Structures are given as structure tokens and as C-alpha cells.
């Protein structure tokens, strides 16, 4: 089991409260959304992995926001492509 001190993570983010929010978002990405960890897993839980990534400066609120915006853009592009394919199919029928 990994022993993690959060002091380095707090120093990277600025305060404990924001660090908790960033760590929770990143842990959720790893556990639920299937995002790949940026550090070795070493049989650690997603929360520990998230804290280690924050300590190393790999994850910040800004990087999470940018990743989220990119995911939304990709999802919207896929939806637009699907709608366009449907519309083209209907035009062929008419």
C-alpha cells in the first residue's frame, strides 16, 4: 500500500480545497472514464495515482479543463458527423 503525503500536491495546486477538487476529478477520469494514468500504477488506487500526478505537476485544474473541453469537442464532432450521415441517407431516399 502506498503512503502518500499531500503536502507536495498542495504546494503544486495552491490550497487543500482546490487540491481535493482536482484530485477527485482526476481520480474519476482514471476510474470511471478509463483515462490512462500518467505515472506507473504500482497497484495503487485511482486517488493515489491522481495525487502522485499532481505532485509531479502533470495534472492541474487547467489541464483537466482543457482535457474536458477537448472531449466535448470530439463528442460534438462525432454527433455532427452522425447527423450528416443520416441527412445524406435521407436525401438519397427522397
Swiss-Prot record:
GO cellular component labels: DNA-directed RNA polymerase complex
Which keywords has UniProt assigned to this entry? DNA-directed RNA polymerase, Nucleotidyltransferase, Transcription, Transferase
The lineage, from the top, is: Bacteria, Pseudomonadati, Pseudomonadota, Gammaproteobacteria, Alteromonadales
Annotated HAMAP family: RNApol_bact_RpoZ
Which SMART domains does this UniProt record tie to the protein?
RNA_pol_Rpb6 (SM01409)
Protein name (database record)? DNA-directed RNA polymerase subunit omega
A GO molecular function assigned to this protein is: DNA binding
Q: Which reaction does it catalyse?
A: RNA(n) + a ribonucleoside 5'-triphosphate = RNA(n+1) + diphosphate
Origin species, per record, is Shewanella violacea (strain JCM 10179 / CIP 106290 / LMG 19151 / DSS12)
Amino acid at each position: 500500500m502506498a503512503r502518500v503525503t499531500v503536502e507536495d500536491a498542495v504546494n503544486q495546486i495552491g490550497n487543500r480545497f482546490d487540491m481535493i477538487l482536482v484530485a477527485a476529478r482526476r481520480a474519476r477520469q482514471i476510474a470511471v472514464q478509463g483515462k490512462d494514468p500518467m505515472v506507473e500504477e504500482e497497484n495503487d488506487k485511482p486517488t493515489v495515482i491522481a495525487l502522485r500526478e499532481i505532485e509531479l505537476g502533470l495534472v492541474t485544474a487547467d489541464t483537466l479543463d482543457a482535457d474536458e473541453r477537448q472531449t466535448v469537442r470530439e463528442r460534438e464532432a462525432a454527433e455532427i458527423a452522425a447527423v450528416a450521415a443520416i441527412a445524406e441517407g435521407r436525401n438519397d431516399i427522397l
